[in-house]
Amino acid sequence: MTKEEKKFILSSNHGELKEYFLKNPRKLLKFLEEIRLENISEETVDIIHIFIFLIVAGEFYLKNDNFNEILCKLSKDKNHYEHENIALIFENLHSPKLINCVYNLTIMELDYMEYDEFFNIARKCTYALGYTNTPKAKEKLELLAKNENELIREYAIKQLNRHDFTDKDVEEQD
């Protein structure tokens, strides 16, 4: 990503960016992968925030499976603060290809989320696993039902009781 492109991203409003990237979704993927690999600075964190907002607002993730890989990578990356938004995307996707990624995000400890007494990321991830409704998702929820954290256990048990887990598994992505 060039300096001019970064300037465009940081100076444009969300509507302009959404319109631009709806026409060029591959460019959004390319930029997101590039920025993820850069040294983290206030600017790169801002750009990641903008991109995640665009992915959610533009529902890019529903239109293009190529977003799964970068979202999975970002979910593992502790150098930004968008994990809850990524969990929301996973909840909306409920993709069997992302089961391991969703599970790993559920149990990931993030210093910046210490204040979150309700473990919202874990809640969204357990919903994602429940909505996925496959035997592999059930296995992950059963593991979470044994988690040392009482809320995570409760979230997992709620999803286990809510779904039948009879949907067909597909090859996992991660």
List the predicted regions and their residue ranges.
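Glycine/proline-rich active-site loop of Rossmann-fold NAD(P)-dependent oxidoreductases
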Residues: 80
